[in-house]
C-alpha cells in the first residue's frame, strides 16, 4: 500500500511539480484548482522561484534518492519496488546478484529484468504489482494486497515462458533456481483512466 502511494505521489505530484527548466514549481494541487477559488498562494499555475524556497530543493533531493527506493532485499529475496531503467547488485545469502532493469515505465507497463547471480542459486524475485492495475482497488484503505491479478491484467514470464507466481503483500513472487542471464518480463496493461483528486 505504501509503495503504491509513494509511486502515485512521485509521478503525479513530485515530478509534475517542477517545470522542465527547473525554475517554476507548483505550491498548490492543480488537479483540484477550479479556476474560481484561489488556493494557498492564489496561483493555479507554477510559481516563479523566490528568495527562500524550501519545497523545490526538497523535490530535487527526492529525485536523486529515487534509485535507493527501487530495490529491497532480505536473505533470500529480491524486491523490485519501483520500476524504471536501472542497475544494482544485491548481496543475498550465498551469492551476489546483479540486476538490470529496462523499462519505459510509467509510459509503458513492460518491465524486463535480467538476473545475473554470481553462481546459480535458489531465491525469490518479488515484483510489485501496483494496485492501480485494478481500478476498484486504487489506494483504498481496505485494498487486498494478496489478491491474485486476472491473467488478462498482468503477464509474467521467465526466459520467454509464461510462469506461475504467488501474490504476497502486493508482490508477484517467483521462487526458483536462477542462472546467470535469466530474464524476467512483466507486462502490466496501462489503459488511461480518469482519477479524481479528493
Residue map of PLM features:
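Aromatic (Trp/Tyr) and acidic
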Residues: 1-139, 167
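Functionally constrained cores in energy, signaling, and assembly domains
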Residues: 2, 13-14, 61, 67, ...
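Short polybasic amphipathic segments
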Residues: 88-90, 153-156
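Short loop/turn segments at connectors of secondary-structure elements within structured domains
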Residues: 121-123, 150, 180
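Glycine/proline-rich low-complexity spacer/linker segments in large multi-domain proteins
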Residues: 137-149, 188-198
